[in-house]
Amino acid sequence: MREEAGPFNYLACQTRALRLCPEITDNLVKREPFRVQDGPVYVGEWSRELKQRAGKGMQIWADGSVHEGQWARNKAVGLGRLIDADGNLYEGYWLSDEFHGTGRYQSIDGNVYEGEYREGVECGVGTETWPDKSKYEGQYFDGLKEGRGKFSWPDGSSYSGEFRQNDICGYGEYIWASKNVYKGQWKANKMHGQGEHVWADGRKYVGAFHEDFKEGEGKLEWPDGRSYTGSWM
């Protein structure tokens, strides 16, 4: 994977890393490869004054994981790239050895996330894509889809609205590949609460839903003008 990714661009990370940790340019020397206390091998710059990893460097673990980028106070900081033992790749900003800021994560399975991180997990706004062409664009919190977003499926179906802990939950609009449309409340990925369902053939139902089914009070209208208002079970 490291050969496929190519050389890491240290120049791109200089400005951001210096702003985060200005001392990383102080008294830096290039050290020969050495093993740090917790086991990995470090190759790169070193703070002579602080006796710590600082500046540009690469760290290699026994399992083959490799991190290249900026260091300060013995921790990854600024822009860096990690390729783990399984071939998963992250390139982006770091703070105190954690993904923090904007970055791109590509799993060995082909899933890709591009967006914001906080303390090692997706948090903020991002885009996630899968090999089957599914795509999510929206908000994340604590590593989960949370807030407003849009999920698109390869068959042309899409959902735009609220998510809670990775589930469709709250208010949103779902458009099926068949062009049926539902606007309303959701719970645990199911139509649940008040909503409006319009079919491609012109039928329309407005009323209560329970776990994807019409249940409670509602009104169903047909294209020919007929309608029914009442209770559904």
For the regions a language model picked out, list residue spans one by one.
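Intrinsically disordered, low-complexity repeat tracts enriched in Gly/Pro/Ser/Thr and acidic residues
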Residues: 1-233
